[in-house]
Amino acid sequence: MPVARKPLWLDFRVKGFHPDPETNQPILVLEEAQGRFLLPIWIGMPEAGAIAAHLGGHTLPRPMTHDLTHALVTRMGGQVVRLDVRDIVDGTFHADLIVRDPSGREHVVDCRPSDGVALALRFDARIRVSANVMNRGAPILVDEPRPETMAIRAVAVDDWTARAKLGVALEETDPDAFGKFTA
């Protein structure tokens, strides 16, 4: 009988954003902890705004969805301990938030990676990506000179331009519009 192997995980952190050159949709760029790989994940503007606001230390006058979720989990004595980006199905990334309750029991909650990153940042939680995702998710080797990845790599390594573009887009968006988006 074959021995079941534990999945291999790599630690990642948020590197920055890059707008898709064709659609202007935000691309969240995750960087492997040792700086060897970048993993681009296309996300929605509301999630990009939530991540960017937190990274920039901005507090909005009213709590947004991720702030509310953080407050609920915290006030109930829980803690998000990590985000596991575990799979890609039909080009869509799938992830799990691992939430520890006050008794120490861990609960696995299915989520989109973008929401998971927004919450992991608020809890200072670990972000991991499975080897399965790395094998199927088109990671970018930092030193690999492929023309189709040069724009993402350039912004990820020095993402001031992308931050400025995202900042302008967010400044031009009415804050009330974030409540009108539907999934």
Task: List the model feature ranges, each with a label.
Residues 2-183:
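Divalent-cation
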